[in-house]
Structure formats: structure tokens, C-alpha cells
Amino acid sequence: MDNKLNHNDDNTLIQTEDVIGIDLGTRFSCVSIWRNKRFEIIPDQFGNRTIPSVVSFYKSAKLVGHNALCMKDANPKNTIYDIKRIIGRRMNDKSIEQTKNLISYELVSDESKHENILVQLDKSDYTLTHKYQYKPEEICAQILIEIRRIASQYLQKPINKAVITVPAYFNDAQRQATLDSAKIAGLDVLKIINEPTAAALAYGLGSEKWNKKTGGNVIVYDLGAGTLDVSLMNISNGVFRTLAVGGNTHLGGEDFDYLIMNHILIDFRKKHRIKELQMSKLSQLKLKNSVENAKKLLSTVDKAVVCVDDFYNGKQLYFNLTREFMEMVCNELFIMCMKPLKDVLDSSGLTRQDIDKVILVGGSTRIPKIQKLILDFFKNTQINALTMSLNPDEVVSAGASIYGYIITNKGDPFSDNLVLLDITPLSLGVETLQKQMTVIIPRNTVIPTKKTKIFSTDTDDQDNVNIKIFEGERKLTKNNFHVGTFNLSGFEKGPRGYPVIKITFHIDINGILQVTAHEKKSDIQNGIKITSTWGAKGRLSKSDIETIIKEAEQNEEIDKLYSHKIGLVHRINSVCNAITINLKDNEITLTNADKKKIKADIKSNLKWLQNKDINDLEVTELEKRENRLNKLYAPLIIQIGKKSDFKDYNKDTTTAEIHGDDNENDGGIYERIVLESDPSDYEKEEIKALTATIQDLCKNIINVVNNPISKFSREDIDLVTDYMETIQIWTYTTTATSTIEFIAKINEINKFTEDIMKKYEDTKIFEKNDSFTYKDELQLTCLTLNECIKSNYFSVKKSEIDILSKTIKDTMFWLLGHQNEDNSVYKEKLDQVISICNSVYHGMHRIKELENQPDIPEDSEDSESEDDTTTSKDSESSEITENLALPTNKIRENTSELLKRLPDKIKSSTQNKNDVLLKIDLNKLNPNTDIKYKNIDNHYR
């Protein structure tokens, strides 16, 4: 069908071929169309504006959408949902293991070398007339078929074309699998666009007038049922430029549901004294649906009821869920939801003050706590309100329909005013000497782009080279991903460094990478086209990309060392090569005996390099050999510059000249300007360590005040808990660039806790009362130790932790079935637990007092013997440090120096012996208790 446009009498643009916009969501999907200068959400025949992304197989029927959703309870093993979590992945993907625990149907491998996933229906259900195994693409196609049917029925015409949205982090395999599903559904997908971009389009930001010449910086915060997707875009004159993306592939509304479910199940087991709760899939689904509905209600009311009839052995599950309880239970997940905001700002180099607008997308952004945390993150900026005037469940689909109109109506001025630009998620480059990664297109480069670098050979008489293309952020190619390889051959032979090979990387608007290599002297050229720019199908996910970047940061020092070693080896080879060439020059006035000695020396150095692995080479030895060669044979090295055509291109090939659309400053030498307020790398490490310390401190103080045997008032418990949670959020949202501000925050926490403790000067806060029995003490001990293990507080061998964990688990289950035993029985059990615990407890690494921390050599972190010494010194420290043994923090030895440099107005006027620890007088603790309880989780208060 030709795509023609007609105009009626009142100049309204009419589209003769409709393009629908589809938001294919984890839990619900939505479809819309742009026509007559506005978008319309297309409802189904019952008026529902969203369609459940669910497919159910029942006898000879395939049910999709709302009909399938009704079958989740009655037919759980044959009802398929959350397919978006599965599509485009492989069976060995770590996220699939997590997903398998959250679904009621079965996933199996197709037993091929690729380990593709198949959805397995219930084989025992003989009423099914369909096959029992389906590919995820087939399930997804059924949802798209239903969407297409609804759209065709609404528009009263066949629908063939669509624009489909996907999360920004979707890799090539997931995008390709989505396209395959659309093909199965009979849809021609004109474009797959990112969900955040679609949301920005729906809000009409392309035509908005911004105060800055550079346009507006917009954050799209998309928190759905299964994923969190945060994108930062710059919008200027209709151009949408993605600056950074972040998020979490497995964090969304469903994660809140499951966390609430777990706490409700703990309460149910405790009420009914159930040792091991083995509920059916049907009961699990009923509870899940009830929790989800209650959670939605809590966005508008303060209390909701979770109720499931005949939940387990005829027992009813009943739980009063309050907004306060939900916020407490999900607090850590809510804080995790804020981290991507900081990540995208850091990645783009912008600050909170640079952001002009924040758009909320996804049903989970309706949660009041999420909205409050986002506003707190942008406190003291121009963001006073969040943009959420459109329905967050529908806004992405609306944007997709707008884009569908734009690309099919090029003649419309409305279409000419908008351009979408994507970015490369990982750096692209080639393998050079010693398997180094030489980056040609850096990560986060806007596409389309084209960049070129000059290279040469590293061996004499070479007439061909293999050009290996990699993607990733590590310095060595073995740590990155191989994208493709091609060969350039037939150029003129010559000494190493003689050929001039120009390698060009070009990525077009569709993300297709083309690499060409051209040897200038012989005019030989070859290339390769890689349609899957981000790698082989099924290989990379967003979590993989995040891991690559994280590993690159963690291994930065190791990578620098390897690069330095490789550079030294390369320079020694170059010097030896230059000397060997010049010895053949007749102008060199040396006797044959001298030449023979020099050749033997050069051969010895080269042989030494060949026989050594790069890991075994010492930097000092390499530097020593390089300096010796440079000093001893300086005249011979200089002489090569006088030779005619041959130039040692090899001497610094990795810093070759750059052509194309690189910045004009590339290749130049400039003085680095460092502002006084900029933190050094050293300070950044200290800030990171101090942040971790503050977070641990807050968590431990919360656990102490919520201890069930403590005598803190409810008012003070709530006051301390709220204050500490506010401090935790501050650590994620602060723009502080000085360690002084972080240490001042620690002092502020200590001052706050001191004020609280003054109220209890004459009270034994943890004094054991008569009603606190050995059974209570045993239960509390197990809960405390269990939470400590979960929080990774014990720095000991895994085998010891496993023994302790098993003992605690067995004891807790034993307690469920032995509620009325003699007190001596509970004491015996308690002694057993304490006996096993003591060996672990005394093996822990204690946290050092900040002001008393001794100087430790920087390399001590790698020395086990020095760790042992540190531990023994710690055991001799103050009673508070020993008894409130916190996890080892990451603050290095210079912290004491930082404290000394603090201005007087920040440092306490009195010497606080334990600046990081909660100020508690241990004389008020129960002297008969061997275990000091410090880590009771919030939900027990």
C-alpha cells in the first residue's frame, strides 16, 4: 500500500496508512495510534486500555490477555506470563535462574549448544491439543497477535505496521527476538525505539522551548513491574540525544510484591506454628494477586487487607498491610531505585542542577515513597515537581505511535522537527601489540559516527594482518568481547612499522557497524560488515554491560600495570629492531668483532623477552633493560632516523593520528586544569569508603534500637529509624566532593545518638527482664546471627559460615515444633549454638577506631600475615570495639590524618573515643549474655 497523504478543506492532515505504537510490557501491554493531530489509546472490546501480557493454554484454546489472566489461578502450569524477562536470553543466563523461582510454569533448554529456552507446558494435562513446548518468541507473538486484532477491530481496517518499544538496556538478542515475534504476528516493525525516548515524545518535549542554548536535559524514570530504566536525554530543536542510560533488569513492582509476600509468610508461619511451609502454586498465585492489589491501594490509602481463603491446610491467611509497613519492608529496594539516578548523572558528567525535567513512567512510579525519594534527590534544584500528567501505563505506547507517524509522514512539517539519536553502549576497537585493546569508538558515542586511526605491522616482511574487532572497557582484549575478524593481505613487504594501515569504524543510523582497513602505500583495502553491532546474538544483557564497566573500574590498577609492562616490552623490541637495522648500514664505523658482540647482546635481550610470560615480567627489570639499551646504543638508535624511506612507525603506534569526526583537540598536548574543588582519585576512594562506613553505621544503629529486649521508647525508635534512613538516602544523593563533609556527617550521627542516649543514662537499656526466657533468648540469638550472615558481617571461611548457617536453620525449625519444652532444654540448645558461634565470632575482623588506627603499609591488604597481625591488634582494642564488632570497613590508614586536618568547628571539642560507633555504655548491657545483639531486622520492631 502506498503511503499517501491527503488534505481536507480545513487543512487537517489525514493518514491513509495507520501505524500503531506498541508498548510490550512485562505485565501489561498497551497500543495506541496518532491521528488527527492527537494520540488515541486503543481499548479492547470491554473498554480496557491495557492488555495483560499473558497467554494461557486450555484444552484446544489459546487464551490471551484478560481471559488468560483469569486462568492464572485455575491453570497455573499452562499460563505463561513475564515473557519479557525471558525473551532473547539463554538457559545459562543467571537472571533466568531467578525468574524460574518466580513463575508457575516450567522452563527447559532445547539441548542445543546455544542453550536456547523453551516454555514447557504441563505434560500431565492430556486435555491439551496443542504442542507442549514453545519458544519465548512464539508466546510473545500471541500477545502481539491479540494487540493487532484489537487495533484492527477498533480502526475498522487491517493493521500491518507498528513501532514497538523496548527498555533502553535491551541487547541485540532481545531486540532481534522481539522483531521475530512481530514477524510471527504478521507485523511489519518500522522501528524499535527505547521506552524513555517514546515517553519524552509523548510529552511533546521535542517542540518545547528551553531556557538554555544547549537545550533541555530530561531524565525519564521508568519503574515498571519487572524493570527499572533510567535515561538521561538532551533535547534541543527537536533533536533527542541520549546521554546516558542506567537501571536494573530485575527491580520493579514485582520485587516489592515478593518482599511483602515473604514477610506475610513469616507472620503466617509464626501464627500457625508451621515448621515447613510447602504451599501450592495456586496458593502462591492467590497471595501474589492479593498483595499486588493491596500495594496498588496503598498509593491512595494508608491501609489495605491481604486475605486468601483456604491458603494452607484449610487455614485462611489474613494480614493488615499498611503503607508504613510496606515502606519499612521495601526501604532497601526503594533506596536501590535511587542509585541509577546518580549513575546516569555521573556517566554523563552532568549535575543535579543541570536537569530541567523529570518524567515518571511505569505503574510503580505511583508509589508515594518513590516520588518523595526522587524529589528529595533533586532537593535544592529547579525540579520542584515531577512530570506525570499522562497515565504512566500509557505514555510509552503514545510516544511509539507518534514516532510511527513521524517516519511514515516525512512530508509533514511535524515530522521534520524531530530527530532521535542513539548511543553506543560499549567501546569498540581493535587488538594491537600484546593483545591490547585500542579503542576507536568510545562508549556513549552518539551514532551515526565514523572514526579512523593509523596502525602498522610489528614484524619484518609482513604482507598480511588479521584485524580483530572487540568491544568492552578493559585494557586487554582477553577481558573484552570478540565481535569479528577480517584479513588484510597483499600489501608490499617491508621492515616492521613500514606499512601504513588506516582502519575506519563506521556505525550508521541503524546501528550497523562497518570496519574497513586500507594500506596506503600499496592501496590495498578490505572490510567487514557487522549487523549485530553489540555482539553475537544472545551474548550481552544490560547487567553484562554494567558488569564490564564495573570490572573495568575495579581492575583499573591491574590494567594500568599490564599496559605499562606491554609498553616497556614494545619499546625494548623497537630499540632492538632499530639497532639491528643500523648495524647493516655501511656508514656505521664499527669493527666486525664489535658488531658481533652487539648482535649477541640484542639477541640475548630478545630471547629473554620471548621466554618470559607477561605475568612473570617485573617492571623494574624491564625499565633497567630499556635504560641500559638506550644509554649503551644511543648512536645506533638515533642513526635510524637518517635512513631514507623507512621510519619506525612502530615506536608509538597506539597514539596514532586520528581522522574523521574526532574533536579538533585530539592528538594535541594540553595542560590539564584541575579545579581546587575537584576531588583527587585518592579522595574519591576515601569518599567511597566513608560512604560505606556511614551506611553500615546507620544500619547497625537501626538494628540496635529495634532490639526486642531494648527499653527504648517507641517514639525514640521511630525517631532514630527515620533519621538513619534519611542519612542513608543522603549518601546516595549528596554532591559533596570533600572527605571533610562525610566525616562531619559521621560526627553529626554520633551527636544525634549521644543526645538520644542521654535520656537513658540511669536505665539499663538491654537489661534482661524476668519474662525474657531461654526460649526467647535462643530465638533472638538465631534471628540475630541469621541476619548477620545475610548481611555478610563475618569475615571468615565459607565452610565455617555454612556450618553456622545450617545450625541456625535447624534450630529455628526445631523451635517451631517445640514451643512448650522445659527451660533447661532451651538452655542446652542455646549453649550448642553459642559454642559453634564463638569460633566464628572470635575469628571476625574488627573495625578499627578511626582516631586510633595505626599506620599500615598500602600493600598490607594483600598480605594474609599482616591481616592476622591487624586482627590480633584489634582484639586488644577497647571494650566497645570488641563487643560491637562491626564489619571491616574500607577506610585506609590515612583516616586519622584526615581527622587531624578537620577544622575546629567540625571536630568535637572532647576526644570521642569511637567516632564511628553508636555511643552506648556497655555497662548497661546484660552482663550474663554472651552474644551482643546488634542486628535485628526492621520488621521485628
Curated annotation (Swiss-Prot):
Disulfide bonds: none annotated. It comes from the Viruses. Residues 851-887 are annotated as: Disordered. The keyword Ion transport does not apply. Residues 856-869 have a biased composition (Acidic residues). Keywords: ATP-binding, Chaperone, Nucleotide-binding. The keyword Chaperone applies. GO terms for molecular function: ATP binding; ATP-dependent protein folding chaperone. Belongs to the heat shock protein 70 family. Probable chaperone. This is Heat shock protein 70 homolog. It comes from Acanthamoeba polyphaga mimivirus (APMV).
